[in-house]
């Protein structure tokens, strides 16, 4: 076990509300609260760790009383929570509550759930073995609630002198559901009874024990913790509870065991050397919880009623006494071989220090006995003694080394380096002393030595008597000191290894710190992502609520419209007949309405088919017109392209014509000039003898030029004629194109007009068809109504005839029998008057039916008109409803997809987060066949579990899948 530490028992006080009987009795609420830790009863304050008022919820009580103990139990400490108080003060409600109600459950079901949740969040290298027991102390006998055949179990002590119930059933569990099933099973076997103060009074003390063992698969460290959850029976006054017979015997035993508990609390509070644990089996079982190795929380439950004021004060005094008790708690650790070795070495070092202290004190004592005065600087000093012991051990270790090693050390280390190493070793020794938590023990040793110095004379006398024994003991210690020289070498080597390991561990710590920082950054990122997803989910919830509200409003409006239709059809226009014909007439009206609806549906189907055929024909006509229009547009575009090409060609021809005319003019002029020059040259060659013919040549040249001009003029006129012809052709083509455009526009207008005419005719045809169908339907409905009315009238007429015949027959028989009595008896007269009244009523009914028939015929057109309006309204509502359903379906599908996406994201995050959580391994017990292979026992991840063949199956936290 680890080093112990002291802690006080925590005491919580809870007041229940006034119950119904106390309210009816007119009791006063005597408790007054001051802050969260003090309550006033009759002007006297009582202070506790926490005081809960009557309005405190179960969850708040659990958070303040029990939530911290879960962590302590899983870290290897023992824990106890028990409720104390008088009967009907709310102890069972505090400890158990409503086991399966999330708000009303008490400490036990909440702590069970928290244990598993905490395990899932722990290191994945941990394996857990969890087993539970449930028993009660009834009539001072221990009775197993999970096996009712075990009715008188005994209390024993283990090797550590810790009490336990021998033979009690222990069940291995691996999920909260299994624990709750065990609690339900045990609770069904517990003793309860009805008293004047409580309808479900516990007649026994119940103890639910959770034993948790954990093992680190890497370091092989094993921890164990026990959690006692105790529901005590309440103290009783027979005058108030009205106990009799067996209930009275139970009350005696309950009060006796609670009195023993009070004696134990008083003895512990007063610091008595004797504590009467064995006076009761309950105090024997709770011995470790009261003053032992356990973190204990007591919940004292009180009644605020003035009727129970004395019992409340007694309970508060009990809590105040219990609050002063101190427990010494330590971690329950099973040490490994390596840990035992380290502990052994540690104890050897302590033993060596104590021996040096004894030797120092003996030397000082001998000097005092010899009459010497020991100076203050030579008297015993703990720090000086430790330093000299360390130096002596070092000298012994150095002198005991081999010569070769000494030579090597002398050769390799100088005095300065040796001193430095010695200082370093001294620092390491000091650190080891600090880490081994020897401060407390050294202080205890100092206190003991001070006490010894105060009683020095008595100590001197005792040492004189035991001098011989001490001399022998000194000889033995000297021999042990010689033997421990070798151990000093081992210690030095261990220190060197420890220094190396320390460096390695420091490096590992740095690496782990960096890894932790990276994981922290990643966790912050994941948290931010989760926050954004939560915000998005909130938006989706708001959108969903808006859509739901909108759908609800639409449905409300639809229901309102349908209600108006029902009122218009069923209540106002149809008159309720009188007398016995009401049911028949309602049946007739309903049948008529159903037949109308059937015929209306048939008419609608026919009309839809006709509209479909008409629409098909219109579509065909529209397609033909569109094709014709497309052909016209194609021809127009072709003509436009042709006109454009001809215009371009005409422009090119005109340009070429101008160029040719210019070139011809220039060439003609050049030719004339050349010919004139040639003739002039020829004439010059003939010299002067031909001067007289110059005029003739000149005339000839002028004539030739004139002929060329005429030829050019003719060519120009012919080209101009050709240009005029081309322009005329262009004008004709433009006129033709304009006509085609106008024709196209006319065709388009004609097409639109035909289309509109077709639509108008279709609409009129539809209206005429609807009118014809409605008239036909009204005719058929009227015919059916007339037939129905005729049948009803015929039936009434036949009944009237039969009734008249029967009446005549009876009157005739009565006249024959009573022919002598002309006046007749009073009974016969009454009978005749009754029949006459019936006949008169039938006649009135017949007339009323005739009038109703006439009214119905008059109201038939109105009803048909209203029915048509109703049908149109129903169609509009159906279309709106269909559209709303489609929109709602789309929104629901989109919302479902978004929810699935968010669930998948959250599930993946949970899987990633649980991937490094703790494990609850399946315990292996002798005599059982494993559920899986012998080398790999089956496990269940993520809290899932199953029980097969009554074998305990455990958990590995952080998963969700069975191996």
Curated annotation (Swiss-Prot):
Entry-linked SMART domains: KISc
Alphabetical UniProt keywords: Acetylation, ATP-binding, Coiled coil, Cytoplasm, Cytoskeleton, Isopeptide bond, Lysosome, Membrane, Methylation, Microtubule, Motor protein, Nucleotide-binding, Phosphoprotein, Ubl conjugation
Region spans: Globular: 915-963
SUPFAM superfamilies for the chain: P-loop containing nucleoside triphosphate hydrolases
Location of Phosphoserine modifications: 933, 945
Compartment(s) where it occurs, according to its Swiss-Prot or TrEMBL record: Cytoplasm, Cytoskeleton; Cytolytic granule membrane; Lysosome membrane
Positions of ATP binding: 85-92
Residue positions where N-acetylalanine is found in the record: 2
Cross-link (Glycyl lysine isopeptide (Lys-Gly) (interchain with G-Cter in SUMO2)): 213
Gene ablation phenotype (knockout): Mice are embryonic lethal. They show perinuclear clustering of mitochondria and impaired lysosomal dispersion.
Domains: entry comment: Composed of three structural domains: a large globular N-terminal domain which is responsible for the motor activity of kinesin (it hydrolyzes ATP and binds microtubule), a central alpha-helical coiled coil domain that mediates the heavy chain dimerization; and a small globular C-terminal domain which interacts with other proteins (such as the kinesin light chains), vesicles and membranous organelles.
Subunit structure of this chain's protein: Oligomer composed of two heavy chains and two light chains. Interacts with GRIP1 and PPP1R42. Interacts with SYBU. Interacts with JAKMIP1. Interacts with PLEKHM2. Interacts with ECPAS. Interacts with ZFYVE27. Found in a complex with OGT, RHOT1, RHOT2 and TRAK1. Interacts with APP (via cytoplasmic domain).
Function: Microtubule-dependent motor required for normal distribution of mitochondria and lysosomes. May be involved in the mechanisms of growth arrest induced by exposure to DNA-damaging drugs or by cellular senescence. Can induce formation of neurite-like membrane protrusions in non-neuronal cells in a ZFYVE27-dependent manner. Regulates centrosome and nuclear positioning during mitotic entry. During the G2 phase of the cell cycle in a BICD2-dependent manner, antagonizes dynein function and drives the separation of nuclei and centrosomes.
Protein name: Kinesin-1 heavy chain
């Amino acid at each position: 076990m680890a080093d112990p530490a002291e802690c006080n028992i925590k005491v919580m006080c809870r007041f229940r509300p006034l119950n119904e009987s106390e309210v009816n009795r007119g009791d006063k609420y005597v408790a007054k609260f001051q802050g969260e830790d003090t309550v006033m009863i009759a002007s006297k304050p009582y202070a506790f760790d926490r005081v809960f008022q009557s309005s405190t919820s179960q969850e708040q009580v659990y958070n303040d009383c029990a939530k911290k103990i879960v962590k302590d139990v899983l870290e290897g400490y023992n824990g106890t929570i028990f409720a104390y108080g008088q009967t009907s003060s709310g102890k069972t409600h505090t400890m158990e509550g409503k086991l399966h109600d999330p708000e009303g459950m008490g400490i036990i079901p909440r702590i069970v759930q928290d244990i598993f949740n905490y395990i899932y969040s722990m290191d994945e290298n941990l394996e857990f073995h969890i087993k539970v027991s449930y028993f009660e102390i009834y009539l001072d006998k221990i009775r197993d609630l999970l096996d009712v055949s075990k009715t008188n179990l005994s209390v024993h002590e283990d090797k550590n002198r810790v009490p336990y119930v021998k033979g009690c059933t222990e069940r291995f569990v691996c999920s909260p559901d299994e624990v709750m099933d065990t609690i339900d099973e045990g609770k069904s076997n517990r003793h309860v009874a009805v008293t004047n103060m409580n309808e479900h009074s516990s007649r026994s003390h119940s103890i639910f024990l959770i034993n948790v063992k954990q093992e680190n698969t890497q370091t092989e460290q094993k921890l164990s913790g026990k959690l006692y959850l105790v529901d005590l029976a309440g103290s009783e006054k027979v005058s108030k509870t009205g106990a009799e017979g067996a209930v009275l015997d139970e009350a005696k035993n309950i009060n006796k065991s609670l009195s023993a508990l009070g004696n134990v609390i008083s003895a512990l509070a007063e610091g008595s050397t004797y504590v009467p644990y064995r006076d009761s089996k309950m105090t024997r079982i709770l011995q470790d919880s009261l003053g032992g190795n356990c973190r204990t929380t007591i919940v004292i439950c009180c009644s605020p009623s003035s009727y129970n004021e004395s019992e409340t004060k007694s309970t508060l005094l009990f809590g105040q006494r219990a609050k002063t008790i101190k427990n010494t708690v330590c971690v329950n650790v099973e040490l490994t071989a390596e840990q035992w070795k380290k502990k052994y070495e540690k104890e050897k070092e302590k033993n060596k220090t104590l021996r040096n202290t004894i030797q120092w004190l003996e030397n000082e004592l001998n000097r005092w006995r010899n009459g010497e005065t020991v100076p203050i600087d030579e008297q015993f000093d703990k720090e000086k003694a430790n330093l000299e012991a360390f130096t002596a051990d070092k000298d012994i270790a150095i002198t005991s080394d081999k010569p070769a090693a000494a030579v090597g050390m002398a050769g390799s280390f100088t005095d300065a380096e040796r001193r430095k190493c010695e200082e370093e070793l001294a620092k390491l020794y000091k650190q080891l002393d600090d880490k081994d938590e020897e401060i407390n023990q050294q202080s205890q040793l100092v206190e003991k030595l001070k006490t010894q110095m105060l009683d020095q004379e008595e100590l001197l006398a005792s040492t004189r008597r035991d001098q011989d024994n001490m001399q022998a003991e000194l000889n033995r210690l000297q021999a042990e000191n010689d033997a421990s020289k070798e151990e000093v070498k081992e210690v030095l080597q261990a220190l060197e290894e420890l220094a190396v390991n320390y460096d390695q561990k420091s490096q590992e710590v740095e690496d782990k710190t960096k890894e932790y920082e990276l994981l922290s950054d990643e966790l912050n990122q994941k948290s931010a992502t989760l926050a954004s997803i939560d915000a998005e989910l909130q938006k989706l919830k708001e959108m969903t609520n808006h859509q739901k509200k909108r759908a609800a409003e639409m449905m409300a409006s639809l229901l309102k419209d349908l209600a108006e239709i029902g009122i218009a059809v069923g209540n106002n226009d149809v008159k309720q007949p009188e007398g016995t014909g009401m049911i028949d007439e309602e049946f007739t009206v309903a049948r008529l309405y159903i037949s109308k609806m059937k015929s209306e549906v048939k008419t609608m189907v026919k009309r839809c088919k006709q509209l479909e055929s008409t629409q098909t024909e219109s579509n065909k006509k529209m397609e033909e017109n569109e094709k014709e229009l497309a052909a016209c547009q194609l021809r127009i575009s072709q003509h436009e392209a042709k006109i454009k090409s001809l215009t371009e060609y005409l422009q090119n021809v005109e340009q070429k014509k101008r160029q040719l005319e210019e070139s011809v003019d220039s060439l003609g002029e050049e030719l004339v000039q050349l010919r004139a020059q040639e003739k002039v040259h020829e004439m010059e060659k003939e010299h002067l003898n031909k001067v007289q013919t110059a005029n003739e040549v000149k005339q000839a040249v002028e004539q030739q030029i004139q002929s060329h001009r005429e030829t050019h003029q003719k060519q120009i006129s012919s080209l101009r004629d050709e240009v005029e012809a081309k322009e005329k052709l262009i004008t004709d083509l433009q006129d033709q194109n304009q006509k085609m455009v106008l024709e196209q526009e006319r065709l388009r207008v004609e097409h639109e007009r035909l289309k509109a005419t077709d639509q108008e005719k279709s609409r009129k045809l539809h209206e005429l068809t609807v009118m014809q169908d409605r008239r036909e339907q009204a005719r058929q409905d009227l015919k059916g109504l007339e037939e129905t009315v005729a049948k009803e009238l015929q039936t009434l007429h036949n009944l009237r005839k039969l009734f008249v015949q029967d009446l005549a027959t009876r009157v005739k028989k009565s006249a024959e029998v009573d022919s002598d009595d002309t006046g007749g008896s009073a009974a016969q007269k009454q009978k005749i008057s009754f029949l006459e009244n019936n006949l008169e009523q039938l006649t009135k009914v017949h007339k009323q039916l005739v009038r109703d028939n006439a009214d119905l015929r008059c109201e038939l057109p109105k009803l048909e008109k209203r029915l048509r309006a109703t049908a149109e309204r129903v169609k509009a509502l159906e279309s709106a409803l269909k559209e709303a359903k489609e929109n709602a379906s789309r929104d629901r599908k989109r919302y479902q997809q978004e929810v699935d996406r968010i669930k998948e994201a959250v599930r993946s995050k949970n899987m990633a987060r649980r991937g490094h959580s703790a494990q609850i391994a399946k315990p292996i017990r002798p005599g059982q066949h494993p559920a899986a292979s012998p080398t790999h026992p089956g496990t269940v991840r993520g809290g899932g579990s199953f029980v097969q063949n009554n074998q305990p199956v455990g958990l590995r936290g952080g998963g969700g899948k069975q191996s």
